Amino acid sequence: MLAKAVSAYRAALGPRLIAGYALGSLAHGGFSPLVSDVDLGLILQDPLRAKDRMTIYKVARSLRTGGSTLDERLSVFWGTPSTLRGQRRGGRFPPLDRLDLLDYGRLLTGQDARSSVARPEQAELLVAGAEFALGYLGGAQKLPGRLRDWAPLRPRDDHVLNEIRAPSQLVSRGPRRLTKVVLFPVRFLFTAETGQVGTITLAAEHYLAKAYAPAASLVTAALAWRLEPPTDDEATALLGRELVLLYVHYIDDHITRLRAVNRQRLADSFRRWRARLLA
């Protein structure tokens, strides 16, 4: 899939394509054919052009219609040296994915250009993860424009809070959605604490090693569900017992962290998210 995507972007972008990278689990390990995304990172020559976004979008849309499940999961991150250094806005390379590029990016084509990428600070990773969670996991009723590209898998009906409170709805969406909803908070906690991306397995092991790890059985089970789907009854029962506990733990942790870096408005959004979750 990535070879096909790289070829398509080479044809569309020509010499402006400096480098292409495998990202995510295809770079740092832990890829699951059942649930994992196919992440591609592109670095283009400056200057950024007005038509770049549409070019990237059109090629990605065409590739996603290739007919396979993996084709549908393609996610493309892109920028130029100036956007990746933070000198100008544009492109699509959130801090978490920039860190992934720096630490794990696997060069697929072109010349390695990661020296032009600014390493995000830990507070930036915390805030970016929190903003993504508010959009993707149901805390924000409306996602700001600059964040819409960050959460392409966000459910259109914005009913994730209902999924958390009524686990049978979440199970009915399939193992990909199910494992993301369970394991994203675990991964965000790991990054907030360590300043690292790492694999989902590493993040889960870090979480489970703690003396206080709410929903430990659910986190352990979700790792297995990435490889083999659970039975509906098994998953629904476990989610019903532990999913809200996991989210309350994650939200409370991040309220404290966000206040510590003077992001009071974002912390307040998390507090409102908690209230809606428990209503």
What function would you assign to each model-found segment?
Residues 54, 58-175, 179-182, 188, ...:
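Conserved NTP/Mg2+-binding pocket subregion across the NTase superfamily
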